[in-house]
Amino acid sequence: MDLESEIIQLVRQNIRPKFPSLNDEQQARLDNALKYDVNYDILKKELVEYIDDWKRNEYYDVLTNIGDLQRLDLGNMLNGDGVSFPKLHSDLANLPRFRLIDNENEMDQSLLHKYDSLRTRLIEKCRAIELIRSATNTDVNYQDINSMLSVVELRQWRDEIQMEWKELAQNLELILKTWPDLTEEKRSKLLQLIDSSSLKSILHIKDNIE
């Protein structure tokens, strides 16, 4: 049931007088005798106007009590010539840290705990904001990286590279063993290439050839 229906139901329930001294039958006879004709469309219209007036008065009360504070001013407090995040971070870090000595008052301990907790949380949030800002200003194109990661399955890509690397090593081994016209100079260069690369961990070509 919406608010409008609830209000109309309450009006219907309370528009006729109720007498605790009457029993149900007597109350029903009284209700039938006092039939009020209520125009609920007019009631709804007046109700909406009343709510609008109430909202308007509440707004003016807030505006009067707080003052004409521009939303832009809130932004300038942390930008431009106002208080910067590094300055705010530094000021928070320089706030004193208190300690109770010979004081077991629970209210004092609770207040001190809240102060330290709030100070720590504010420092951590300022530090996090500074890190996010510095990461945002770097030259790394995160959009390109994310798009690449969404297209390439890195694990599958790594497995394919390992298979191709092993196939390359096997081909080199075959070349060294079966090519009769391969000169000693070229053979030596290939062996040096294998010896200085990751192929050495895959094949022991040098030992087999020699």
Curated annotation (Swiss-Prot):
Keywords of this entry: Cell cycle, Cell division, Centromere, Chromosome, Kinetochore, Meiosis, Mitosis, Nucleus
Domain of life of the organism encoding this protein: Eukaryota
Main location class: nucleus
Keyword Nucleus set for record: yes
Nucleotidyltransferase in keyword set: no
Any one biological process term the GO annotation gives: cell division
Cellular component terms per the entry's GO annotation: kinetochore; nucleus
Subcellular location: Nucleus; Chromosome, Centromere, Kinetochore
Subunit structure: Component of the inner kinetochore constitutive centromere-associated network (CCAN) (also known as central kinetochore CTF19 complex in yeast). NKP1 interacts directly with OKP1 and AME1.
Family named by the database record: Belongs to the NKP1 family.
Purpose of the protein: Component of the kinetochore, a multiprotein complex that assembles on centromeric DNA and attaches chromosomes to spindle microtubules, mediating chromosome segregation and sister chromatid segregation during meiosis and mitosis. Component of the inner kinetochore constitutive centromere-associated network (CCAN), which serves as a structural platform for outer kinetochore assembly.
Designated name of the protein: Inner kinetochore subunit NKP1
Species for this entry: Kluyveromyces lactis (strain ATCC 8585 / CBS 2359 / DSM 70799 / NBRC 1267 / NRRL Y-1140 / WM37) (Yeast)
Record lineage: Eukaryota, Fungi, Dikarya, Ascomycota, Saccharomycotina
